[in-house]
């Protein structure tokens, strides 16, 4: 049994890694949820029992319905080869309706945008716990500027260790997060023991009443703060590929109990200390419920938990981007697999981008209070889009229509209420995540629909049969009218069904300056689900100089095409599949393999293309994004090989039949 299969089973190690990777975001919500609710209602001096009981009831039932029911019980069943998240969900249902791509694009863009705010708000909140704390005669963190500096240092270090992989990080974070959740539960129950009557918050009636009660000064807008308790639910779904759903389902009950106890404990403390710190703007009930002799320990533990919360979003972002690339929502990117688990990935470009944006957000908002005002808006949009896709998934699984409609109406109503309340955050900072999400959405829209238009309008003869050109290529190899371009000309070209190839590849060989070579190689790289596969198959179509190579490489294998190809050439020469390539001038006596020239073809829009203005803009924007983001030489491990990048005209749509009219020569008269 291989590792991929084993990972699906629940184990103690798997549970520990799940606690370390998946629950960071939702596990740090107690740091700021009650603080936000109290602050929005005018501070601790203005709260009463009805507000606290109702608010905690809202929190408990929000986490129950959205996280437990929707994500743990329903969404985790909707995995695509073990991977979760909104893009994996879309991949499962996309054949049911073309329009489903819209919620997938919107939800994915919003989730990626929200991932830039989570690290900033969680780390800043935890470090603010140190602000003005005295150690003897010293105050190490006397101002918000020092908080910002420490926060940025922590974030930069966090992003720097991502290349180690989630397995290594999870093993380190798992035990710490287990301590964190246990600490939340113990502190919560210690404070709750002073007022067990607060357990009445379990009754959902209190949650409904507080929305219209005069004790709640912000009305339905309180949901904007309550929603912060469940923002990590979508990240939980996105991270399932890193730890498996069995380990998430097995660990969630303990996490849920610890979170619930902590919220109840904070509520109990607030009710018994209404006049405490009434004028302190930095008041945070999370740290106040902790005994003073444990305050420093709580802050240190909260800081580490905040770092892990950031990790949950970062790993989820890597997964989302990889899935987006495979679905042609985003350009291809360099993906690194730090472990033997295919679901555990690292994308250097995305890591750098999230790091830069997150640090910029810390500088822009400066305080956790301002960040909380912007937090959660984007994720409500993602949750709504996930609900739409889950409705279709349930239909695919044959669930009765009435159950699907109940599911859709119930969760769309709940999430719609949260969205309405979160919209008030737009002018207070929510616009930042909206702008980031909009930017990502534009890129994904252009890439996806640019590809769609290209595929739809591409000439019918865009693909040709390679075996129909073998005779012409053989003749070119022996034609002395042309100089030898290279001994081996290699095209990184996907050969479909072992015979179809894009015409532009043959155009590069034949229609431009003909490339005479001893052998023509067409190499296709296929990535397998096994980590260390290294196999190849060849088809020469009955020739000695036209070779279709299918490389099958495990996801952890380096794609060093030039290294593999030299071995393949030696083996094919040895068994007589191709002719030897003896070198007259060489520093290696007996060398029988010639030089290699790797050709990578890039598209440019041809003047012959005839598209509508919109179609032309989309295709040109898509080509521009491709040229901006891609480095094919690094994809294939050809950085140090003889690589040529050629531009080949891309002809789309109907050709213009006539450009200029021929006339008879005009007689010229002397002046």
UniProtKB/Swiss-Prot annotation:
Entry GO CC: plasma membrane
Keyword terms: Cell membrane, Ion transport, Membrane, Potassium, Potassium transport, Symport, Transmembrane, Transmembrane helix, Transport
Superkingdom of origin: Bacteria
Example of a GO MF term: potassium ion transmembrane transporter activity
Membrane association type: Multi-pass membrane protein
Principal location class: membrane
UniProt keyword ATP-binding, yes or no: no
Transmembrane segments: 12-32, 56-76, 99-119, 139-159, 172-192, 218-238, 251-271, 296-316, 345-365, 374-394, 400-420, 429-449
Name of a matching Pfam family: K_trans
Subcellular location: Cell membrane
Catalytic reactions on record: K(+)(in) + H(+)(in) = K(+)(out) + H(+)(out)
Task of the protein: Transport of potassium into the cell. Likely operates as a K(+):H(+) symporter.
Family: Belongs to the HAK/KUP transporter (TC 2.A.72) family.
Record-given protein name: Probable potassium transport system protein Kup 2
Source species of the chain: Lactobacillus acidophilus (strain ATCC 700396 / NCK56 / N2 / NCFM)
Gene: kup2
């Amino acid at each position: 049994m291989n590792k991929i299969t084993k990972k699906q089973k629940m184990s103690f190690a798997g549970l520990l890694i799940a606690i370390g990777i998946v629950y960071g975001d939702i596990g740090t919500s107690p740091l700021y949820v009650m603080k936000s609710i109290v602050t929005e209602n005018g501070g601790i001096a203005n709260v009463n029992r009805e507000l606290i009981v109702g608010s905690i009831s809202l929190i408990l039932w929000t986490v129950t319905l959205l996280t437990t029911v929707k994500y743990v019980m329903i969404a985790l069943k909707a995995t695509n080869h073990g991977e979760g998240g909104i893009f994996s969900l879309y991949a499962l249902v996309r054949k049911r309706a073309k329009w489903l791509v819209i919620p997938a694009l919107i939800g994915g863009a919003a989730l990626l945008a929200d991932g830039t705010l989570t690290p900033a708000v969680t780390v800043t909140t935890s470090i603010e716990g140190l602000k003005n704390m005295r150690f003897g005669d010293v105050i190490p963190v006397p101002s918000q500027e020092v908080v910002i500096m420490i926060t940025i240092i922590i974030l930069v270090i966090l992003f720097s260790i991502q290349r180690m992989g989630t397995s290594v990080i999870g093993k380190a974070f798992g035990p710490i997060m287990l301590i964190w959740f246990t600490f939340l539960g113990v502190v919560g129950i210690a404070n709750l023991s002073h007022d067990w009557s607060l357990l009445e918050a379990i009754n959902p009636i209190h949650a409904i009443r507080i929305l219209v009660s005069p004790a709640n000064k912000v009305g339905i807008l309180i949901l904007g703060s309550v929603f912060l308790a469940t923002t990590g639910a979508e990240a939980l779904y996105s991270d399932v590929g890193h730890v498996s759903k069995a380990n998430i389902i097995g660990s969630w009950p303990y996490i849920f109990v610890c979170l619930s106890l902590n919220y109840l404990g904070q509520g109990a403390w607030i009710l018994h200390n209404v006049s405490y710190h009434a004028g302190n703007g930095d008041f945070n009930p999370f740290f106040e419920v902790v005994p003073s002799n444990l305050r420093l320990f709580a802050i240190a533990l909260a800081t580490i938990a905040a770092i892990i919360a950031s990790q949950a979003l970062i790993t989820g972002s890597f997964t989302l981007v990889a899935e987006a690339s495979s679905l042609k929502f985003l350009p291809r990117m360099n993906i690194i697999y730090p472990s033997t688990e295919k679901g555990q990935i690292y994308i250097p470009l995305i890591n750098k981008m999230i790091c830069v944006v997150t640090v910029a957000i810390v500088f822009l908002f400066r305080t956790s209070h301002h960040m909380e005002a912007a937090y959660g808006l984007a994720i409500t949009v993602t949750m709504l889009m996930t609900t739409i896709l889950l409705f279709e998934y349930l239909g695919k699984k044959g669930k009765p229509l009435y159950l699907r409609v109940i599911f859709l109406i119930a969760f769309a109503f709940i999430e719609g209420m949260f969205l309405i309340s979160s919209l008030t955050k737009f002018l207070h900072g929510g616009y930042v995540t909206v702008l980031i999400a909009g930017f990502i959405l534009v890129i994904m829209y252009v890439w996806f629909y640019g590809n769609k238009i290209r595929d739809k309008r591409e000439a019918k003869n865009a693909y040709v049969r390679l075996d129909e050109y073998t005779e012409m290529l053989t003749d070119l190899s022996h034609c002395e009218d042309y100089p030898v371009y290279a001994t081996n000309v290699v095209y990184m070209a996907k050969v479909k069904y072992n015979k179809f190839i894009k015409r532009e590849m043959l155009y590069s060989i034949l229609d431009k300056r003909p490339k005479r070579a001893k052998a023509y190689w067409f190499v296709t790289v296929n990535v397998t689900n096994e980590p260390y596969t290294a196999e190849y198959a060849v088809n020469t179509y009955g020739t000695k100089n036209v070779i279709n190579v299918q490389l099958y490489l495990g996801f952890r294998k380096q794609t060093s095409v030039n290294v593999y190809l030299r071995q393949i050439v030696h083996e094919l020469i040895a068994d007589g599949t191709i002719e030897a390539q003896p070198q007259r001038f060489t520093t290696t006596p007996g060398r029988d393999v010639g030089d290699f020239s790797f050709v990578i073809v890039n598209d440019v829009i041809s003047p012959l293309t005839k598209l509508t203005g919109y179609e032309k803009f989309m295709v040109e924007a898509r080509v521009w994004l491709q040229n901006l983001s891609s480095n094919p030489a690094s994809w294939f491990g050809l950085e140090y090989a003889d690589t040529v990048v050629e531009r080949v005209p891309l002809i789309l749509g109907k050709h213009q039949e006539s450009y200029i009219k021929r006339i008879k020569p005009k007689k010229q008269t002397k002046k």
